[in-house]
């Protein structure tokens, strides 16, 4: 399929990579298709690829407007992104590009500088008098995660945590998914309004305990890997349960949806 051709191209470009950033490749597509559409489609393509074949329908829908030459540029952008994250692990590659070219000041889309994220993480995790370590639940939550910078900062201190990000922006959710997945961090991302509890999309990022390969799984109302609609077609769903990974189960059934009492 075209997706596997894309994979082979990515591998080839990674072997022959230079210091060209992913944004430079996307800018070559922007005059024809628009910068916002190109960036959003790039994120969606990457998430589909990281879903390991479970999002073929959405993948082909996303690449439909582009010809072979343009898809080749997406391959180069993906390879450049992987190499950039390999050179600078646990550092957000999306926020600066998004804020410079695409953020909406009227919506308050200003991303927290990474230095401030590190300071917040140190303040939150600083030992306190009579502080007792929590057993079992080892999650860190950012209810307005943006591109996931605060979660990446927390991962620099402890990668073994489960990282949970919430954002009302679908684009921000995709950025966080990619940041968690390509840094091999277990976590969950929810496209939702954290104030009203309206939820549109849920994803799990799970790193296989044996192969150490991270994979993205979309979960909706207890159904794993259900083909999604495009972002514009999403309808709000009530938050009625908690999604939890289940250990020691076969891959097809390792996610449990627990209804609230």
Task: Kindly give the residue locations of the regions a language model identified.
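Conserved S-adenosyl-L-methionine
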Residues: 116-207
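N-terminal amphipathic/basic-hydrophobic helices that include classical n-h-c signal peptides
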Residues: 1-13, 244, 248, 258-259
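Residue-identity detector for threonine
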Residues: 20-21, 62, 69, 112, ...
């Amino acid at each position: 399929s075209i997706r596997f051709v894309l994979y082979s191209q990515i591998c080839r470009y990674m072997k022959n990579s230079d210091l060209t950033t992913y944004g430079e490749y996307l800018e070559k597509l922007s005059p024809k298709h628009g910068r916002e559409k190109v960036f959003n489609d790039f994120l969606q393509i990457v998430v589909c690829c990281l879903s390991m074949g479970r999002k073929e329908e959405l993948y082909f829908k996303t690449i439909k407007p582009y010809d072979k030459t343009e898809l080749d540029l997406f391959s180069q952008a993906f390879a450049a992104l992987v190499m950039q994250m390999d050179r600078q692990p646990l550092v957000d590659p999306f926020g600066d590009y998004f804020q410079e070219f695409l953020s909406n000041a009227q919506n308050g889309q200003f991303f927290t500088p990474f230095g401030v994220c590190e300071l917040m993480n140190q303040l939150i995790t600083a030992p306190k008098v009579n502080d007792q370590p929590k057993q079992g639940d080892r999650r860190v939550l950012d209810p307005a995660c943006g591109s996931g910078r605060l979660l990446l900062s927390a991962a620099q201190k402890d990668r073994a945590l489960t990282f949970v990000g919430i954002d009302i922006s679908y684009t921000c959710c995709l950025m966080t998914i990619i940041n968690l997945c390509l840094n091999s961090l277990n976590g969950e991302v929810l496209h939702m309004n954290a104030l009203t509890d309206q939820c549109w999309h849920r994803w799990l990022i799970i790193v296989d305990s044996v192969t150490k390969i991270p994979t993205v799984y979309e979960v909706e109302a207890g159904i794993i890997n259900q083909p999604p609609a495009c972002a514009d077609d999403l309808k709000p769903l009530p938050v009625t349960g908690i999604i939890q990974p289940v250990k020691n189960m076969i891959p097809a059934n390792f996610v449990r949806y627990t209804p609230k009492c």
